[in-house]
Amino acid sequence: MLQARVQLKRGFVKATTTGVPGGEDVKKGPDTFKRSALLALGALGIVYGDIGTSPLYALRECFTGAHGIPPTPANVLGVLSLIFWSLIIVVSVKYLLLVMKADNRGEGGILAMMALVMQRQRAQPSHRSRPMLITLGIFGAALLYGDGIITPAITVLSAVEGLHVATAVFDPYVIPIALVILVALFLVQRHGTADIGAVFGPVMCIWFLTLAGLGVKELVHNPAVLGALSPWHAVELFRHNHLHGFLVLGGVFLVVTGCEALYADMGHFGRKPIQLAWFSMVLPALMLNYLGQGALLLRDASAARNPFFLLAPSWLLYPLVALATVAGVIASQALIAGVFSLTRQAMQLGYSPRMEVVHTSAEEMGQIYLPGLNWALLVGVVALVLGFRSSSALASAYGIAVSTAMVITTLMAYVVARELWGVRRWVAIPVVGLFLSVELAFFGANAVKVADGGWFPLLMAVVVFTLMTTWKRGRDILAAKLRASSIPLKVLLGSFGDHPPVRVPGTAIFMTGNAEGTPPALLHNLKHNKVLHEQVVLLTILSEELPHVPHSERVEVEPLEQGFVRVVARYGFMENPGIPDVLKRCREKGLQFQLMGTSFFLGRETLIPTKRPGMAVWREALFAWMSRNARSATAYFRIPPNRVVELGAQVEL
């Protein structure tokens, strides 16, 4: 049975889950609701930052964006109806009630879902849908990198633009102020958020209460706007506006752009606390604010230029800009952390080269910082702000990547429902068809934005997809080449009977990706040094398609003959493998050695691109470049550098 406990560490509230998928998120007991409430508060600061800051710009873009429609009363009610039903169908039903059930041992996100499906199909490697699902999953993950760059830019910029409403004096300083905030945000990533993360939830709670209060203030003056909850107004909008009514969906879509991040962050808090936060606070606050903005537009159509900030009285504008900026920073922080986590998953699943991973908290293993990726994101965000120069222009670039990722998630959820849950086709197809009809409409409306900026996230997704697939394919080709040039371990051990090598004291650990063959580094050592240590450990570290591997299953130790020992260590895609941990588990299994008398032998391949079958020459050259720039195995696995011997070899791809 899945169990969860609440951990309170330095102000953090965290759900820790163990067991099988599909169980309860919170351990049953008299204080269940209290635990759920604490976790829900934490979810406000991490999970709902992106979708919670959409009121800053979403409704405005429906009327003033590149494909906006006039803010007539009928159009206002129609857009509000579309917003309400989008939040219900896409967020509430699809993600909160259905997709979040597709967890991989408590973890969510498109790569976690792909790994979940791959587990099921591992026994059927010839399954026809397997290559397609892998391609969809990797491309969906690549799309989210564009979201990770655009979200910080648009949320912070739209918040600072609230100064336009207060006074024109700040107009020349909006972009510099936004850039200062964004640069500071990325500079503090190296220090982590352990000390300030505890306030994220309460601050976002204040933000959502403010959203609700601003909306209610205007609603009491024009309660007729509540009629927009009827889907009839959405139908009327399409009937009267025709193509323009369809294109306005590109603006409506901005209210649901945080869904993929919401699903990816599920592992932090569990499904039920996230649902509790949505239905008890986030959804009511969002709808009250959108309805309040709509009521303002019914009273004054000119307010369409910035309906969110015009909801506030003049004396509240500066505090509201400050609060919106803080909320935007929190939303951006969640997206940046999500990109770090996604990249770690890609590394563990074999779709990304090794990068430097810094743990910013001694207590929470999930809080990580990737320096190289952090600076790449900063460059991308600054370039977006300087290139687009306004949140309205950025809105044109927003949407196409996320809408495509949503379609991919729906298709993969169908596979999960059919193959893992056993849902009958006649039940699954209509449900998936409903979601696809909505999401494909959003995709079509966003597709027209490609020329206006939508090309940026698509280009970025193609680049990331190319890098990820090239790395995976290159590693597979390299592994096949090394296996072909290797010899079975039994053959090597058998040859020692006639020509035994000289044995020297100590332990040698040879790291190898092939748990059955002889490590190339071992053969090179024998060839050049003509000696073997008294104890030889063949160590293979495997990444499983699970988020976490139980400690009891972490390490397998298999004694072989002539002083050889085979060790297989398994890690999940949410874990960081490390030699200190492996050695500790080996000692617990009875494998004895002295670290200062142990040498680690690693192979280091120099890759030579060729015109042989496998990959195009340009992809082989790209793979060789990625391999040269990947973090060394010594640093990545935290091997004592003064105990490492690297043996090189040239490999023609």
UniProtKB/Swiss-Prot annotation:
The keyword Cell inner membrane applies. The chain crosses the membrane at residues 37-57, 79-99, 134-154, 168-188, 196-216, 243-263, 278-298, 320-340, 368-388, 397-417, 426-446, 450-470. It is a multi-pass membrane protein. It catalyses: K(+)(in) + H(+)(in) = K(+)(out) + H(+)(out). It is found in: Cell inner membrane. Disulfide bonds: none annotated. GO terms for cellular component: plasma membrane. The keyword S-adenosyl-L-methionine does not apply. Pfam families: K_trans, K_trans_C. GO terms for molecular function: potassium ion transmembrane transporter activity; symporter activity. Keywords: Cell inner membrane, Cell membrane, Ion transport, Membrane, Potassium, Potassium transport, Symport, Transmembrane, Transmembrane helix, Transport. It comes from the Bacteria. Transport of potassium into the cell. Likely operates as a K(+):H(+) symporter. Belongs to the HAK/KUP transporter (TC 2.A.72) family. This is Probable potassium transport system protein Kup. It comes from Myxococcus xanthus (strain DK1622).
